[in-house]
Amino acid sequence: MKKLLITGFDPFGGETVNPAWEAVKLLPDTIGEYVLYKLEIPTVFGVAASTVLNKAAQIHPDVILCIGQAGTRNAVTPERIGINIRSARIADNTGNQPLEQPIVPNGPDGLFSTVPVKAMADAITAAGLPGAISNTAGTFVCNDTLYTLLHHFQNTLVRVGFIHVPWLPEQGSPSLPLADTAKALEAAISAL
């Protein structure tokens, strides 16, 4: 079986829950040909990516899929691209709030996800859930993590992707119930 390292962030911005990690925890241990290795990561610039890289060095995954919260979205959205910028409107969980800084000095402006984002979005929709491709992972820790991982695994066989999920109903609107978010992630993984 192939190995999928799937991550979810801890709560940030004053929240007490993060639907990304909560949904990851609900996923089965295997989906299709993948064994899932689940990892909670901190919402901290640089540290989130290094936490993923450390785990990847231990387990040697075939695919890394990070899951993050995007409270303003009404769909589960595989990300098409990571961009080489850190620019935070709020501080991360250790108080860092970089503005207009490159993630990798002199690195490419953007790096495309190496997972099949269209097939993943289509699989989510086919499961009867809201799914769409996103063309921006923002400029907060989610994008920082996506870009760092894409840069690190360039020219390797490890595929890297990111999916943003909506708030839970108790967090605000738009939202998606936790069970539906987990079902959407399972559908996306089935399209890898």
Regions found by a protein language model. Give the residues of each.
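Active-site-adjacent mobile loop/cap segments within catalytic or ligand-binding domains
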Residues: 144-190
